[in-house]
A protein has these predicted regions:
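Lipolytic serine-hydrolase domain surface
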Residues: 2-161
């Protein structure tokens, strides 16, 4: 979903369509200045800067369960976790190399967050979310090295098959 989607509507729609795509991923920045203004203008929090208190108990519990068992990933993009990111950034998903690399790994290879080098966390309420760990650069290098090895092995296999 777009980060500016209404949070409550997003949760309702996610409950209906979560089984159709491979995964649904939302990356949030709780200090996103554009989404602060959007919340004021639209009179409700946005998917990219959600306010869980807007949900009723059933929807809140569904989100906790979805984060643990379903094809839904919540990623926290905090400036404190992302070197050089402006804490109020709205363009971090394409402006920051860690986040844009994560987006590409998800879109091109359909990797789950752990496979992309992200770190699993849980809130006090049990909501599972993912963060960029301090050693993300090294984790990303390992992921990329694995992709290169896999591609090289596939190319070698293709070459053997074509010469037989």
């Amino acid at each position: 979903p777009a980060p500016d989607a209404d949070f409550r509507r997003f949760v309702g729609e996610l409950q209906a369509y979560h089984g159709y795509p491979r995964r649904v991923t939302v990356t949030v920045n709780m200090r996103d200045s554009v989404l602060v203004l959007s919340r004021l203008h639209q009179r409700g929090s946005r998917a990219g800067r959600p306010d869980p208190s807007e949900l009723g108990p059933e929807d809140a519990q569904w989100m906790v369960e979805a984060s643990q068992r379903l094809d839904f990933d919540l990623i926290s993009a905090r400036a404190g976790d992302l070197p050089g990111m402006d804490r109020r950034s709205h363009v971090f998903w394409y402006d920051h190399p860690w986040v844009s690399s994560d987006v590409l790994l998800k879109m091109l290879f359909h990797f789950e967050p752990g496979q992309r080098g992200l770190q699993r966390n849980r809130s006090e309420a049990g909501l599972q979310y993912w963060t960029f760990p301090q050693d993300y650069e090294a984790r990303l290098d390992a992921v990329m090295d694995g992709l290169v090895r896999t591609a090289a092995a596939q190319a070698q296999q293709d070459e053997k098959t074509s010469t037989q």
